[in-house]
């Protein structure tokens, strides 16, 4: 008998050699029916995996992210099998699970159309009904190469040839179809109850623009058709909220072929941007941060010293000035370090909190660019805090509180992940353990639940990631808090302690918005372009019913401007209903409508974007009401 430790802390004894599915059945019949795989001692495995020793076991269902990945991965194989049944000459590349579903990259002499996707989806449903078993088998590397060459799959051959010579290569067979794959998978195709092919895009083989452009077919899968329908409705809503579409309609920003990945902000977009930055400055001033600004271009030697050259070079841009080599900064931290080093520091000076709205440049492949969400130039709201080791926990708690206050203002809920040491990192095991424990302790002290995200930390330290949940349930990773023992060592940072000796500070890196550009993109989609009054580019639109009120419109607008309210006037010779509809289309929070009666009574008629007609009131009362809404930053979605 062997001991199995379960997720809930309980232990059970089972016979040696039992499969994961058998263990699930011992726990409950309903669990065994829902099970898609398991995590055994930290490794994700399939249901047929045999257990031969004491271990920890967590059964995975579609409610678990890893469970979703298993089913999505199997769905990508079903897609590939359907394509090969219909078009045997098509060459297969890769087909992974992704956050919202799966895709498969294929090389075909023809273009896939929406009509062809329907045909492929129909064939996928046939394969699902057949409930074909997925069976794993392995071959030595040379045999695997020959096997794929015989199947005329050059992309698979290339992948195998990249593996070490002594590799054992795994494949999955489902009926007449075989694919190169490490797994895991569900036991049979019938588990993918509800599939949908969503779209087609171009993708360079291995993400390299010098390679052939393949066709990428995206899809998604669920266990229930009702869940698929809910997801498709969500996708329709997301399309309506697409920040690229709304950004154009509301005249907020544009992106041009002269600068792919470099957004142009229009006047109304700049109002939003400046409003967010002013709010950021106000919050940081109250939290005792000092704002700095550091250069965009710095000598290449600095990036060698910081470690960015070794760990981030592929994402950087470089230039020459005179005879020197320089880099355009991808991160702000080395600049903050130079400011810290500019003076002798005492323990009495710490914590030293430097905040910066720093413009950074990072190379992204053209296929990855996406509106404001994925760009090559953006403004990062960085702060770098230099603390003593004794102050780490207190300072991280203050940072978490600041981030929490920020997100509440916008009406966001969030969840937290703790990202641990990646493979490509620097520093000792001891430093990484100390930093990771420091973050865990801070999260425990503030009572925040969190998930561990293995291997996704920065190259210089572990981090806490804040994932915002928008009003239609999507999540966006924005804020981060990183604890860093490495940079202070590399740059020989110190402070004079109470004992008169030099000591090494610890560095905390953190962002709240993350990227201002991306945060604006998220807000556009979160609010569907209907920004709260305090953020809205135009807070009030004043309009007349006839030409007789034109001067009164100008008078009302002047008073609003004097009270720092953002206002536009509409005195066009158009019907008032048309003007109101247009203001609604532009998502202006308030409209002031002026006719003969309002002009005679020296008052105004107010209409709200949200509530409709509010009625007549004095201009003074309206200003008081609106200024209170703006000052309180009321942000109802």
Curated annotation (Swiss-Prot):
Family: Belongs to the class-II aminoacyl-tRNA synthetase family.
Keywords: Aminoacyl-tRNA synthetase, ATP-binding, Cytoplasm, Ligase, Metal-binding, Nucleotide-binding, Protein biosynthesis, RNA-binding, tRNA-binding, Zinc
Descriptive protein name: Threonine--tRNA ligase
Superkingdom of the source species: Bacteria
Recorded name of the encoding gene: thrS
Keyword Metal-binding: yes
Gene Ontology biological process terms, A to Z: threonyl-tRNA aminoacylation
Cysteines paired by S-S bonds: none
């Amino acid at each position: 008998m062997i001991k199995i430790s379960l997720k809930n802390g309980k232990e059970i004894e089972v016979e040696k050699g039992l499969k994961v599915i058998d263990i699930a059945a011992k726990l409950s019949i309903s669990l065994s029916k829902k099970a898609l795989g398991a995590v055994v001692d930290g490794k994700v495995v399939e249901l047929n995996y045999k257990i031969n020793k004491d271990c920890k076991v967590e059964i995975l269902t579609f409610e678990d992210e890893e469970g979703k990945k298993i089913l999505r991965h199997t769905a990508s194989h079903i897609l590939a099998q359907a394509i090969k049944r219909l078009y045997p000459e098509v060459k297969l590349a890769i087909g992974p699970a992704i956050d919202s579903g799966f895709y498969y990259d294929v090389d075909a002499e023809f273009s896939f159309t929406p009509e062809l996707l329907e045909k492929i989806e129909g064939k996928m449903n046939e394969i699902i009904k057949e409930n074909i078993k997925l069976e794993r088998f392995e071959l030595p590397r040379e045999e695997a190469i020959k096997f794929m060459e015989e199947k005329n799959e050059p992309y698979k051959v290339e992948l195998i040839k990249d593996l070490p010579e002594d590799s054992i290569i795994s494949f999955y067979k489902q009926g007449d179809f075989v694919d190169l794959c490490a797994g895991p998978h569900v036991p049979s195709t019938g588990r993918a109850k509800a599939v949908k092919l969503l779209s087609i895009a171009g993708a360079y083989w291995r993400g390299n623009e010098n390679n052939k452009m393949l066709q990428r077919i995206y899809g998604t899968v669920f266990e229930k058709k009702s869940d698929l329908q809910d997801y498709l409705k969500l996708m329709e809503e997301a399309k309506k909220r697409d920040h690229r579409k709304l950004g154009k309609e509301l005249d907020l920003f544009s992106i041009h072929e002269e600068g792919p990945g470099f957004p142009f902000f229009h006047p109304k977009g700049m109002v939003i941007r400046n409003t967010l930055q002013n709010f950021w400055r106000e919050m940081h001033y109250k939290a005792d941060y000092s704002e700095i600004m550091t250069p965009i271009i710095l000598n290449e030697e600095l990036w060698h010293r910081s470690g960015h050259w070794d760990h981030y070079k592929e994402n950087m841009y470089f230039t020459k000035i005179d005879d020197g080599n320089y880099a355009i900064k991808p991160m702000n931290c080395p600049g903050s370090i130079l400011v810290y080093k500019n003076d002798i520091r005492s323990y009495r000076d710490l914590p030293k909190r430097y905040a910066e709205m720093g413009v950074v440049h990072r190379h992204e492949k053209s296929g990855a660019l996406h509106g404001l969400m994925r760009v090559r130039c953006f403004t990062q709201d960085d702060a770098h805090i230099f603390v003593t080791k004794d102050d780490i926990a207190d300072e991280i708690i203050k940072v978490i509180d600041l981030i929490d206050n920020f997100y509440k203002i916008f009406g966001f809920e969030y969840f937290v992940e703790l990202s641990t040491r990646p493979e490509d990192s620097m520093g000792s095991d001891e430093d990484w353990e100390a930093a990771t424990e420091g973050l865990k302790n801070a999260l425990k002290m503030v009572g925040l639940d969190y998930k561990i995200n293995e291997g996704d930390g920065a190259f210089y330290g572990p981090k806490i990631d804040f994932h915002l949940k928008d009003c239609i349930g999507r999540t966006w990773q924005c804020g981060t808090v990183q604890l860093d023992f490495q940079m202070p060592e590399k740059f020989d940072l110190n402070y004079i302690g109470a004992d008169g000796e030099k000591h090494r500070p610890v560095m905390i890196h953190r962002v709240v918005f993350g990227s201002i550009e991306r945060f604006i993109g998220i807000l556009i989609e979160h609010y569907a372009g209907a920004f709260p009054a305090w953020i809205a580019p135009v807070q009030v639109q004043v309009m007349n019913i006839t030409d007789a009120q034109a001067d009164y419109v100008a008078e009302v607008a002047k008073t609003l401007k004097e009270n720092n309210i953002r206002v536009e006037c509409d005195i066009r010779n158009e019907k008032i209903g048309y003007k109101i509809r247009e203001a609604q289309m532009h998502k202006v929070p308030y409209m002031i409508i002026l006719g003969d009666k309002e002009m005679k009574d020296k008052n105004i008629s107010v209409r709200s974007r949200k509530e409709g007609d509010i009625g007549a009131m004095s201009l003074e009362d309206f200003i008081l009401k609106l200024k209170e809404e703006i000052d309180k930053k009321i942000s109802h979605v």
